[in-house]
């Protein structure tokens, strides 16, 4: 009930202003009695992923809490893990406003945020300051003004700084809102990046005496051949996991709606089937050697179960969480326990 009232107010506001207000409010209330308005108890449904044990298979996707400011509040809602970021080595403002748009009739969102964040050093401070013991994955990317050819350096800088504090690290090469970023998904650029990241991971594991798994986040706008090539590169470079998928550049199912022609990545319900298709194709290519987090268009427990059936071990929500609220977490976990 509280969420529906809050949502009604927020949906009258500019989307980015509403988002910032929500994150700020959650930051203030995460460890206070006021978290009673969104705190919920989720029955355990443990799942093992990349060698880690999570209390349940439902996570918060990257992009909601980019700078890790409200981790404790999201823990109170019952998430099994939170993925913060995308974070870059240096702070950057992102793309020009406006850059976030609701497509309410389709339960979709278009964003062209452009990795706006306060930088990796700020994120590390927030990871150190968090009170809860929730699993936190850190999604890393490159700065906009870093040439693609030098992009791997940005990923290695972020890895070096977040490694001691992350449950896992997610490598984001699939956002459509940083020029040239998606080119890292192909050919020699992909192989060079994954090889450099794996080498760095092993160095850091030795230095810190702990192994932090690494997953690659991919786009939904890929051909089967491209998916096969990515799968081969993941296996070759012994990556620990994959996250499928990011937002799409397609506009299937939203034609004619207000804001549908805005540039950027489309998420939410219009992405559901495409994301599930990519998960199924990727799982077939990986042949059980590398586990997958399924994300994209999960608006119900049924949507999540479809991701599991397609080959995902865990799922993440973002747009569905905005439209459905924290109850979606509990609904998915309960359905997972019964499946």
UniProtKB/Swiss-Prot annotation:
Compartments it resides in: Cell membrane
Pathway assigned to this chain's UniProt record: Pyrimidine metabolism; UMP biosynthesis via de novo pathway; orotate from (S)-dihydroorotate (quinone route): step 1/1
A GO CC term assigned to this protein in UniProt: plasma membrane
Pfam families in UniProt: DHO_dh
Membrane topology: Peripheral membrane protein
Cofactor binding comment, as recorded: Binds 1 FMN per subunit.
GO terms, molecular function: dihydroorotate dehydrogenase (quinone) activity
GO terms (BP aspect): 'de novo' pyrimidine nucleobase biosynthetic process; 'de novo' UMP biosynthetic process
Active site: 175 (nucleophile)
Catalytic activity annotation: (S)-dihydroorotate + a quinone = orotate + a quinol
Cofactor dependence: FMN
Enzyme class: oxidoreductase
Annotated binding of FMN, by residue: 62-66, 86, 139, 172, 217, 245, 268, 297, 318-319
Subunit structure: Monomer.
Function (record text): Catalyzes the conversion of dihydroorotate to orotate with quinone as electron acceptor.
Name this polypeptide is given: Dihydroorotate dehydrogenase (quinone)
Organism name: Shewanella sp. (strain W3-18-1)
Upper classification of the organism: Bacteria, Pseudomonadati, Pseudomonadota, Gammaproteobacteria, Alteromonadales
Gene: pyrD
């Amino acid at each position: 009930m509280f969420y529906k009232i809050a949502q009604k107010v927020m949906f009258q506001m500019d989307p980015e202003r509403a988002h910032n207000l929500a994150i700020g409010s959650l930051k203030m209330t995460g460890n206070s009695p006021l978290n009673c308005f969104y705190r919920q108890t989720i029955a355990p449904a443990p799942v093992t992923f990349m060698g880690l044990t999570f209390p349940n298979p439902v996570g918060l996707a990257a992009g909601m809490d980019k700078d890790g400011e409200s981790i404790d509040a999201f823990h109170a809602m019952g998430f099994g893990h939170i993925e913060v970021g995308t974070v870059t080595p240096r702070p950057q403002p992102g793309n020009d406003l406006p850059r976030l748009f609701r497509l309410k009739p389709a339960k979709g969102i278009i964003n062209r945020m452009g990795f706006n964040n306060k930088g990796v050093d700020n994120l590390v401070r927030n990871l150190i300051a968090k009170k809860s013991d929730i699993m936190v994955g850190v999604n890393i990317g490159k700065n906009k003004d870093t040439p693609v050819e030098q992009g791997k350096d940005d990923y290695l800088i972020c890895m070096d700084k977040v490694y001691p504090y992350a449950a896992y690290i997610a490598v984001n090469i699939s956002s459509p809102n940083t020029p040239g970023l998606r080119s890292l998904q192909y050919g020699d650029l992909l192989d060079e990046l994954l090889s450099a990241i794996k080498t760095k991971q092993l160095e850091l594991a030795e230095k810190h005496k702990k192994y932090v798994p690494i997953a690659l986040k991919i786009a939904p706008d890929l051909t089967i051949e491209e998916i096969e090539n990515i799968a081969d590169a993941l296996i070759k470079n012994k990556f620990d996991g994959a996250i499928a998928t990011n937002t799409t550049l397609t506009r299937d199912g939203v034609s004619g709606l207000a804001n549908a022609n805005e540039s950027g990545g489309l998420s939410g319900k219009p992405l559901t089937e495409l994301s599930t298709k990519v998960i199924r194709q990727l799982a077939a290519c990986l042949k059980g050697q590398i586990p997958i987090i399924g994300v994209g268009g999960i608006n119900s427990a049924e949507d999540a179960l479809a991701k599991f059936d397609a080959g995902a071990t865990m799922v993440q929500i973002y747009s569905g969480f905005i439209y459905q609220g924290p109850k979606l977490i509990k609904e998915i976990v309960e359905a997972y326990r019964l499946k």
